[in-house]
């Protein structure tokens, strides 16, 4: 799975879950500061990532996923393992 493919899928999930335009979901975008997510939204995003990519993200790891790039990097690291 390529980084571009992961980014595309993460971008769609974030856009759908948070109701923001695709073009606002950049790699640098912070879920809370830039995209308006609250803590519940963040939990729901992590759950959506788990389902989409068939992986489990422990709470301590989820706390470190603040940006779109963080999510992409985390997913890539788990899928490469």
From Swiss-Prot:
GO terms for biological process: lipid A biosynthetic process. Keywords: Cytoplasm, Fatty acid biosynthesis, Fatty acid metabolism, Lipid biosynthesis, Lipid metabolism, Phosphopantetheine, Phosphoprotein. Residues 4-79 form the Carrier domain. It is found in: Cytoplasm. It comes from the Bacteria. InterPro entries: ACP, ACP-like_sf, PP-bd_ACP, Ppantetheine_attach_site. The keyword Ubl conjugation does not apply. Pathway: Lipid metabolism; fatty acid biosynthesis. One of its GO terms (molecular function) is acyl binding. Belongs to the acyl carrier protein (ACP) family. PANTHER family: ACYL CARRIER PROTEIN, CARRIER DOMAIN-CONTAINING PROTEIN. This is Acyl carrier protein. It comes from Synechococcus sp. (strain JA-3-3Ab) (Cyanobacteria bacterium Yellowstone A-Prime).
